[in-house]
Amino acid sequence: MSEDRSAYPFSTFLDQHSGQLNASDVPPELWHSLYKKLSDQTFDAGDHFQIICEMNEDDEKTLFVRALEDLHNNDEDNIFLIDHFMSFSSESARKCVESTEGLVERLAGLFGIDTDSTEEVDETVEKIETSVEKEEAEHAKKISSETGNLPRHESVDARLSSYSVDDPKNELTEKVLKALWKYSQTYSVSYQLDNGEIEKKSVWYVMDDFGTRVRHSTEPNVRIVPLMFLPQNCAYSIMFLTKPVNTDEEIMMDWASNVITAQHPEWRKYIEQPWAAQDFSKETMIPDAPTLEYFTSGRNPDFLAGPTEQQTCQSAIFTSLPILKKRKIKVYADDTQLTEHLKNHKVEYVDDIKKADVIWMIKHFHDYKQLSEENPCGMINQFPFESCITVKDLLAACAMRDPAKNDWYQLTYNLNTQLPEFVARFQNRELNGQHNVWIVKPWNLARGMDMTVTEDLNQIIRMIETGPKIVCEYIPRPLLFPRPDNGNKVKFDLRYIVFLNGIAPVTAYVYNRFWIRFAINEFSLSNFEDVETHFTVFNYLDKEKILQMKCENFIETIEKAYPRIQWSEVQKDINLTIRKAIEAAAKEEAPRGVAPNVQSRAMYGVDIMLQHGDNDVIKSTLLEINFMPDTTRACQYYPDFADTVFETLFLDEIDPTKVTPI
């Protein structure tokens, strides 16, 4: 492409890529040489380095890379392109490996894994284009042109799999999949959705035979970082020296270099587990209590009304309530999805918070002190510091304050603050043959997004590179539902709408109707990458896979399938679980907990899963609590839903046929 450089000048390259290069700490003196090599597609690492294969006395093969000549890190030409052999997402790794003919054997050769295959594995590995790479290329174009929804991966019913661990091919597949988390790296790409929002997706990749054979060291002499080359909508890795290298010296990189290692250098031995395994099973599994900074770092503070203002507001709301019931309700709203469905109550929208009876906001509100002073009669649909309920890592911190007494939330660790304790727990369970399947969740994304179910410690450790995560014990024995449409016994979860009217004491109600989300495939504790087996929330492309069922029909089916179950008893346990969660989140003073505020009311979407407990008793487990849940289906199914919301939260009209106190 050298003749085309005039059409793509260096200045344009800098405009498009300087942000990436600076973020990766690529020395500026190397940028022009990188530009030329990318433009000309010059892969010249083979002119300066050599892949070496050594066999020990046990015929075990070791692959590494050494320099063919003296090289200096200040030489502007000493920056090298590395191609990517394959790309995948964490949930699609197995599908990519199993569905591409010959890929298992080729990856085994790339990773230096012995194979009993009679077919000779070619040591020179050509690039494999997986479905993820095709998607990646298409979506990269959409960054600058069109918008589009993210794809979801195909799924295979677990019952249709002829998988057998005794099959040599499957044994090799498992070795390759485990090795992926030693030899893969990651970057993220941004997509613009139809609604204009920007969404990030993590892409994992394996470098070509050269890059893969650069071994790990805590004293590296090169760095290898990914770069998205925008003119081609294609990702490469680039390698540059961090110190001079002598002839025949092995080149090595720090595979464990990431944000968490930089923040917690004392954790390096845990983060290095994929490359330098150690036994931590005897170390403590109990993390320290979260600090005050844990609850405040990176979050905007809420300003609380004092006791005098609270008392004034309580009196003002009590006095104004009879008047409010007789006239239009003045509403300040930044979203009208719910309020436009009010039928029994007339609304007048106002654009000044000080004039509103009800403040209904999706945007987070912070100044409760100012509200108490300027509008003591007003009520708002948020509580101060309610992130302790609605944000995954903070809810987990509240739930895990006394894990021995916690029977409503799965054992959870924050990988960004409690990684050593989690590694010890995982290895201790592995040593004792205990259930050891975990689900990795991002702190701040909707359910089903960037989640991974796995029993691979190395994979879990690597997941911290794609953003803040918690890891929860996976429910091994969920109550299953017999789907009438496909006959599968599937996982499900329940979405409840909960109204919180007060914190001290807890005053809360649950809407008497709930919604059910079903998985698609037969449940089994295998094939953890299959989203349609292990997840219940995803964006369907195939609408025929959606099973909609009203709660009355669901209860009837469950009681018929499980004659020992009385739903009324299950519902009592669910209500108790929800109350325990709210009490745990409000147990300590703000910012370590939700703060009481007489002007506050809130509606939450609470997700519950049922599982078999001791003596096969059905027990409820809380998954998460969502701020301002989507009420589209609720308003469609139940035309009086919006009125019930306002009557319960703001008008003190509690209808026991619609809601139940918890």
From Swiss-Prot:
Binding positions for ATP per the UniProt entry: 472-475, 491, 493
Keyword Transferase: no
Keywords: ATP-binding, Nucleotide-binding
Matching Gene3D superfamilies: ATP-grasp fold, B domain
One Pfam match: TTL
Phenotypic effect of disruption: RNAi-mediated knockdown at the L1 larval stage causes a reduction in egg-laying, likely due to a defect in the egg-laying apparatus muscles and in hermaphrodite specific neurons.
Top-rank lineage group of the source organism: Eukaryota
Reported function: Regulates microtubule dynamics in uterine muscle cells.
Protein name: Tubulin--tyrosine ligase-like protein 12
Organism, as annotated: Caenorhabditis elegans
